[in-house]
UniProtKB/Swiss-Prot annotation:
<feature type="domain" description="G-patch">
    <location>
        <begin position="25"/>
        <end position="74"/>
    </location>
</feature>
<feature type="compositionally biased region" description="Basic residues">
    <location>
        <begin position="192"/>
        <end position="236"/>
    </location>
</feature>
<feature type="region of interest" description="Disordered">
    <location>
        <begin position="131"/>
        <end position="267"/>
    </location>
</feature>
<keyword id="KW-0539">Nucleus</keyword>
<dbReference type="InterPro" id="IPR050656">
    <property type="entry name" value="PINX1"/>
</dbReference>
<keyword id="KW-0698">rRNA processing</keyword>
<feature type="region of interest" description="Disordered">
    <location>
        <begin position="1"/>
        <end position="26"/>
    </location>
</feature>
<dbReference type="GO" id="GO:0005730">
    <property type="term" value="C:nucleolus"/>
</dbReference>
<comment type="function">
    <text>Involved in rRNA-processing at A0, A1 and A2 sites and negatively regulates telomerase.</text>
</comment>
<dbReference type="Pfam" id="PF01585">
    <property type="entry name" value="G-patch"/>
</dbReference>
<dbReference type="GO" id="GO:0003676">
    <property type="term" value="F:nucleic acid binding"/>
</dbReference>
<keyword id="KW-0690">Ribosome biogenesis</keyword>
<dbReference type="GO" id="GO:0006364">
    <property type="term" value="P:rRNA processing"/>
</dbReference>
<comment type="similarity">
    <text>Belongs to the PINX1 family.</text>
</comment>
<protein>
    <recommendedName>
        <fullName>Protein PXR1</fullName>
    </recommendedName>
</protein>
<dbReference type="InterPro" id="IPR000467">
    <property type="entry name" value="G_patch_dom"/>
</dbReference>
<feature type="compositionally biased region" description="Acidic residues">
    <location>
        <begin position="142"/>
        <end position="158"/>
    </location>
</feature>
């Protein structure tokens, strides 16, 4: 399972090979076996079969839990990856060993079933009596009847063949007619869909054109209005800037008026250009470097 698996801590004792238990002569097991005639260093089993007897020390496993016998098998199954057999089956198909893998899967399934429902079939022999003789007589009569039936069936089979052929031909004709009708209906549907699509496209194009024309008209009107406003403002500024002589006041000299006009004209021109720039969005965007 890797790092995601359950970590099992194993603590090794002072005697990991369990030699202290086997060498201890004070325990009940050692005393009981010595009473039965066993001596230290001898093997287990009958004296006449010492060649087949066990000569190694007996190793035991202490049961320190309350789980029943065979519970370790279930624990071993949990460690296996889910769907591993399916993955092996897929690999076997890719490698050209599909039959071997299927046979292995079938064997494993049978093992599981045998483990759950263990059964051994024992044959109990066959019953013998009058039933077998009756079946033999009945079989001979059935053979005679079958011979007579076969002759009749041969005569009827020719008519059946002809009727089958005619029915097959009729079915084939019906299928071909049905296919033609389906094809015609499909073509009509395609044509209707195409015409609808063309109409929709034409409508969309017309709407786009109308929108474009409206937009252009609106822009032209706005430009015209701006121009008219601009002209009106310029005329108004000119009127306001021109000096109005009052009655009873002395007229300025020609040299002073010419100088005044030159200064005022430059100032008025600057103010006019500034106002025009503020009113025009395009020029403002150019000044502030803003893209439309």
């Amino acid at each position: 399972m890797g790092l995601a698996g359950v970590s099992k801590k194993i603590k090794y004792g002072k005697d990991p090979r369990n030699l202290g238990w086997s060498n201890n002569t004070e325990r009940f097991g050692h005393k009981h076996m010595s009473k039965l005639g066993w001596k230290d260093g001898e093997g287990l089993g009958h004296e006449d079969r010492k060649a087949q007897s066990i000569t190694q020390n007996i190793k035991i496993v202490l049961k320190d839990d309350n789980v029943g016998l065979g519970a370790g098998l279930a624990k071993a199954d949990k460690d296996e990856a889910f769907g591993l057999m399916d993955f092996q089956k897929l690999l076997g198909k890719l490698n050209g060993r599909a039959q071997e893998i299927e046979a292995e899967v079938e064997r494993q399934q049978k093992d599981v079933l045998r483990g759950k429902f263990g059964m051994v079939f024992v044959s109990g022999g066959l019953l013998q009596g009058t039933i077998e003789e009756f079946n033999k007589k009945r079989g001979s009569e059935a053979v005679e009847e079958s011979d007579s039936d076969s002759e009749e069936s041969e005569s009827e089979s020719d008519d059946d063949k002809k009727s089958r052929k005619s029915s097959k031909k009729e079915k084939k004709d019906k299928k071909s007619k049905k296919r033609k009708a389906d094809d015609d209906s499909d073509e009509e549907e395609k044509k209707s869909k195409k015409s609808k699509k063309d109409k929709k496209e034409k409508k969309e194009k017309k709407e786009k054109k109308e929108k474009k024309e409206k937009k252009e008209k609106k822009e032209k009107k706005e430009k015209k209005d701006k121009k008219e406003k601009k002209d009106k403002k310029e005329k108004k500024d000119k009127k306001s800037e021109s000096p109005t002589p009052h009655d009873g006041m002395e007229k300025p000299s020609a040299s002073s008026t010419s100088a005044l006009r030159g200064r005022m004209a430059g100032r008025a021109k600057f103010i006019r250009s500034k106002r025009m720039a503020v009113m025009d969005e395009k020029s403002l965007n150019e000044i502030f470097m803003v893209k439309n």
